[in-house]
Amino acid sequence: MNKMQMLKNEHVLVLGLAKSGYAAASILHEHGVNVTVNDQKPFEENEPAQLLSEKGIDVVCGSHPLRIFEDKDITILIKNPGIPYENVMVQEALRRQIPVWTEIELAYHLTSSPFIGITGSNGKTTTTTLIYEMLKKDSQKTLVAGNIGTVASEVAANADGDEWIVTELSSFQLMGTVEFRPKISLILNIFDAHLDYHHTREEYEKAKQKVFVHQHEDDIAVINLDDPSVVKLAEGSKAKKVFFSVKEPVEHGAFIQHGAIYYMNEHIIDVKDVVLPGEHNQENILAAICVVKNAGCSNDAIVHVLTTFGGVKHRLQFVDTIQSRKFYNDSKATNILATSKALSAFEQPTILLAGGLDRGNEFDELKPFMKHVKGMITFGETAPKFVKLGEELGIHHVKHVDNVEQAVPAAFNISEEEDVILLSPACASWDQHKTFEERGDMFVNAVHMLK
């Protein structure tokens, strides 16, 4: 009996719709699994719920009635990753010792295709894209899933069983895994993030660790040797360990020495030939090389991608040059570490556009990275904190505007030729935008309006 056939005996409650919940409910229903959906949004305002109801799926909207567990004899709960574990339905499932999944676990049960699981506090999307592009260039059957694009359960449901499924994984998604076993796992780094969700760093690290906790001796775990937290988390892994380091040569893995990138002491490419901007991306590149080499990828494919790939949209993305000013969109930088790495990528005079949702952070940790910042344009809930930061650093041009759209011309007006104008907010976007992509698109459009 395969993993999916076993699910046919279960009664599944899908909690929260969004993209992943809708996909999970639809796929389970198509496979003949008894599925019920519960979503907080009222039915009459809830188009996804209406569509699922039309398919014949039981939908309960507008509240979270605990009677569902008895009425539907629920045996598995699949929750939207963003729903906190304090939710009454999740708490009831845990009280009843019912497994709580995210759709990543469901995806694992839907296919025999091997997974490559990529997680970390920063760099996930860039690294996931590099891995996908390298394997694709090597003519290997490869799919990409998770936070980066298509919902993982949809990708898995349509997989043939012999493709690599390259999957970007958040801590939210990994918390809801029970048996998920990637063939190759990767933790890029660990930095304090999402503590409003996980409450403690220990719980956050425990979620990240689940990317390799179920791996076997014939699986691969790729480890950042420069991050003590990652090294410690990997100690209990049964998988074969492959390391990468930007600081020192490593025997089993990837490293940089004398201006060149090596894997297992074999020269891959000179650093000067890599087009991806920023020293911080060297970590992502080394990690990607470790993964794809263990997937059988050729050096030619790796070199081709590294000499042509200029960055992922919203991740230190080069937008345009206008009157000798270069504009970069780093809207994905939703925490301090990501923005510090973006600032480290430039030695030119820089005007920083920053601000957003206030999660209680102070931004003093940015100070060592702001030596090239000549001006700041700030917006959102954290704007007063950034104004204070700029004043403390003696930055001459510090301006508070309403939004990103206003920030772009304000930055241009104080800029000079050869300056970098960088959107790297160091904050989530949810105070003013639905997503960081929406914020980044506003920046790009505002840049184009300068022409």
UniProtKB/Swiss-Prot annotation:
GO terms for biological process: cell division; cell wall organization; peptidoglycan biosynthetic process; regulation of cell shape. ATP binds at G120, S121, N122, G123, K124, T125, T126. One of its GO terms (cellular component) is cytoplasm. Its EC number is 6.3.2.9. The keyword rRNA-binding does not apply. It comes from the Bacteria. It is found in: Cytoplasm. One of its GO terms (molecular function) is ATP binding. Keywords: ATP-binding, Cell cycle, Cell division, Cell shape, Cell wall biogenesis/degradation, Cytoplasm, Ligase, Nucleotide-binding, Peptidoglycan synthesis. NCBIfam families: murD (TIGR01087). Cell wall formation. Catalyzes the addition of glutamate to the nucleotide precursor UDP-N-acetylmuramoyl-L-alanine (UMA). Belongs to the MurCDEF family. This is UDP-N-acetylmuramoylalanine--D-glutamate ligase. It comes from Bacillus pumilus (strain SAFR-032). The lineage of its organism: Bacteria, Bacillati, Bacillota, Bacilli, Bacillales.
